Amino acid sequence: NTTMIQLGTAFCSLVNGGKLYQPRVVSKITDQNGNTIQDISPTLLRETVSKTTSDTLKQYMYSTVTSGTGNTAKVDGYSMGGKTGTAQKVPRDGVNYLVSFIGFAPVDDPQFCG
């Protein structure tokens, strides 16, 4: 089994130049006045693919959203890419399917994955 955080972390590494970072939910700690008390730096775990491979995958996933199976996920005003998935549900009768989509934006400098 794979958790959503594991899937998201792995996917983000593919569009982040191949860099796999430890997942985190906090980037800094502030006081009541908004002053930074502590910055929480990202922790690089490893490289999953080369930057060249990452750049190629981003272009493929951009095409998926602009003219492929992920075109219904396109959001006007955003340069985004993504990956679609389809699986048959049991019983496999050719009617019941589970569909999925995971995406990122912007394509040139990904800031969001989900």
Task: Provide a role label for each language-model segment.
Residues 1-44, 52, 61-114:
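Active-site beta-strand/loop architecture of penicillin-binding DD-peptidases
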